[in-house]
From Swiss-Prot:
Keyword Transport in annotation: yes
Predominant location: membrane
Superkingdom of origin organism: Bacteria
Annotated protein name in UniProt: Fe(2+) transporter FeoB
Membrane topology listed for this record: Multi-pass membrane protein
InterPro entries linked to this entry: Fe2_transport_prot-B (IPR003373), Fe2_transport_prot_B_C (IPR011640), FeoB_Cyto (IPR041069), FeoB_GTPase (IPR050860), G_FEOB_dom (IPR030389), Gate_dom (IPR011642), P-loop_NTPase (IPR027417)
Function description: Probable transporter of a GTP-driven Fe(2+) uptake system.
Location relative to the cell: Cell membrane
Length: 664
């Protein structure tokens, strides 16, 4: 099967094009740094496989995710490259395009965001550009799918009759050095003359990954030639001279291809950015937007829908299942397991799906509109005081959905210590798995202020992440503050299709977890409540679950929720935070009183909020722990990532409850 790779700058629509060409769905967002590892999909019409590589501005990698690109181009086998560029930022995007052309591999150029360029008054004669580069160019709008069908039909012809032809003349002295380097590379390695020229150029540009691919003897010979030409070039470094020549080539190339509007008019983006990223009013605007989202999720739309679903699952659905089981003569043990264990456990989590969907919809709306990238800029000023940059906030925002991709997104951070710090604080971001716990408790104890209470927990998670990062960056992970440079994407009206796909995929993941982790956890919790030292079908107070819960309940007694029931729900929370709610449904609903009534009797508003603080901050779930181990390659850092949140949660909850108890 033929392999094709898709490459481009960050946030030019690579993943949108990948989704359009393969029919799959990978997470997309209107900001840079969304793709941090290569993704593989099967092209429609069995054309071949398409590999979506992380966005990069240059083939000299400076961050972990960018090494994936250079490593793939050097070591993997592929039939051709699809280089997608932003038509509204063509000159800057051509920097990477030129480097890819120097590979002298079959290549198509996808001219994306033609609609944005047109709105800005930018005119591009892509036919003329195609003739100059002798490379096929396809105008597309990846977000809507316009032009992608034609591109798909042409991909199978990529490479047919291809003849390597691209070459930039870097001047007599540098070209002589490149020639000598090529001779060494072809003699000492298996690379042909075109690959050798590319390697020589990248070596002169100080691409360290290229150097790592060569043996030490070849590196020493090439380094000697580089030092010689550096003396000949004079005061200007070889790299800077080559970049100057390359920039001149691009300017000449685009001179009669791109026409810009006569006036340098102030676009809508610039005007709105002055307000949304303002150092004084930007943050209040962000908090107000988040409040509106939570108000819609918990008061206006989400909760009423959840109440209807709860009534259906707890009433009509459960009664129907009982009737069917009685008709079929199912033994009492299985009846109890299915109704009191599986339906009660899994159903108690599924009732929050409407709230999850509403929240995900609005988060996707903010992402696709381009607003989230502005928040990263806004937060950069604040995060600098805590030893981080705005680049760390992008993975943190992703953590609002799930902490696992949040940790993986830290690959885009160049500074290794800042990357590690971001990984360690990412679990403090309140993921969607914690939302059912919040929804349950705010619906019982804080009916009039549900959105404010939930917002306060999200803000608390961010504050704790900042405070911990301060400690880490001043002690074991000292680093110099990195300069945060981010490309602000154009504001755009979100695509209904994109919003639907994004919301659907996230909600589907939540439901899928209900069918795996939560299902398994519910069965185990019910069995532990059903079995005890004295046999089966025991009173829950004589069960193994009561024994486990009593031990942990004793430990959290000073935190305000020291009952055995609360203690028992904390343990399976390590599996998945949603299991806390399913465990409560099984434990608290085992008696005659309903779940809500029992919780009201065992918690107060103060202890309920303390419980939510603890759930927010204590140990990450098992999937997050696995992601931390994978990204840090260290059991030491993984152990720290498990231990310190638990200590932090205990101390902060203890302080909150004990101080609050003095006034309430």
């Amino acid at each position: 099967m033929e392999n094709y790779c898709i490459l481009g700058n960050p946030n030019v629509g690579k993943t949108s094009l990948f989704n359009a060409l393969t029919g799959s769905y990978e997470y997309i967002g209107n900001w840079s740094g969304v793709t941090v590892e290569k993704k593989v999909g099967k092209l429609k019409e069995n054309v071949g496989q398409l590999i979506d590589l992380p966005g990069t501005y240059d083939l000299s990698p400076i961050s972990k995710d960018e090494t994936v690109v250079t490593d793939y181009l050097l070591n993997d086998s592929f039939s051709g490259i699809i280089n997608i560029v932003d038509a509204s930022q063509l000159k800057r995007n051509m920097q990477l395009t030129v480097q890819l052309l120097e590979l002298n591999q079959p290549i198509y150029i996808g001219l994306n965001m033609i609609d944005v360029a047109t709105k800005r008054g930018i005119k591009i004669d892509y036919h003329k550009l195609m003739k100059k580069l002798k490379t096929p160019i396809f105008p597309v709008v990846a977000r809507t799918g316009k032009g992608t069908k034609y591109l798909l039909g042409e991909i199978k012809h990529l490479g047919e009759g291809y003849q390597p032809h691209f070459k930039i003349n870097y001047g007599e002295k540098i070209e002589e050095t490149i020639k000598n380097m090529c001779q060494i590379i072809m003699t000492e390695t298996s690379h042909d003359k075109y690959q050798a020229r590319f390697i020589a150029i990248q070596f002169l540009l100080n691409n360290m990954q290229i150097a790592n691919e060569l043996n030490s003897e070849v590196v020493n010979k090439l380094s000697s030639l580089r030092d010689q030409v550096a003396e000949q070039v004079g005061a200007v470094s070889v790299r800077r001279e080559m970049e100057r020549i390359r920039n001149h080539y691009i300017e000449t190339l685009l001179q009669d291809v791109v026409t810009y509007p006569d006036e340098d008019k102030q676009y809508f983006s610039s005007r709105i950015d002055k307000i949304l990223t303002h150092k004084y009013i930007g943050m209040p605007i962000f908090l107000a937007i988040m409040w509106l989202i939570f108000q819609t999720t918990f008061t206006w739309i989400g909760t009423p829908l959840s109440d209807q679903l709860d009534a259906f699952i707890g009433g009509t659905f459960t009664d129907s299942v009982k009737t069917i089981m009685n008709y079929l003569g199912v033994i009492p043990f299985l009846q109890d397991l299915i109704t009191d264990g599986i339906i009660a456990g899994v159903g108690s989590v599924l009732v929050f799906v409407p709230q999850i969907v509403v929240l995900f919809f609005f988060i996707s709306l903010l992402e696709d509109s381009g607003y989230m990238a502005r928040i990263a800029v806004l937060m950069d000023r604040i995060m600098e005081s805590f030893g981080l940059s705005g680049k760390s906030f992008i993975p943190m925002i992703i953590g609002f959905g799930c902490n696992v991709p949040s940790i993986m997104a830290a690959r885009s951070i160049e500074n290794e210590k800042e990357r590690l710090t971001t990984i360690l604080i990412a679990p403090f971001m309140s993921c969607s798995a914690r939302l059912p716990v919040y929804a349950l408790f705010v619906g019982i104890f804080f009916k009039e202020n549900q959105s404010l209470v939930v917002l306060s927990l999200y803000v608390l998670g961010i504050i704790m992440a900042f405070l911990v990062s301060t400690v880490l960056t001043k002690t074991i992970l000292k680093n110099d503050n990195a300069i945060f440079i981010v490309e602000l994407p154009t504001y755009r009206v979100p695509s209904i299709k994109t919003l639907w796909r994004s919301t659907w995929e996230k909600a589907k993941g939540f439901v899928r977890k209900a069918g795996t982790f939560i299902f398994g956890g519910s069965v185990v919790i019910w069995l532990l409540s059903y079995v005890g030292p004295h046999g089966i079908n025991v009173n829950i107070n004589q069960s193994f679950l009561h024994m486990v819960g009593s031990f942990f309940g004793m430990l959290v007694q000073p935190l305000g929720f020291g009952t055995w029931q609360a203690g028992a729900t904390l343990v399976p929370g390590f599996l998945a935070k949603e299991v806390i709610v399913s465990s409560m449904a099984i434990i608290y609903s085992s008696g005659d009183a309903g779940l809500v009534n029992v919780i009201q009797n065992q918690f107060t508003p103060l202890s309920a909020y303390a419980f939510m603080i603890f759930i927010l901050l204590y140990i990450p779930c098992v999937s997050t722990v696995a992601a931390i181990r994978k990204e840090t390659y260290s059991w030491k850092w993984t152990a720290l990532a498990v231990a310190y949140p638990l200590v932090t949660a205990y101390v902060l909850t203890f302080i909150f409850y004990q101080v609050g108890h003095l006034f309430v």
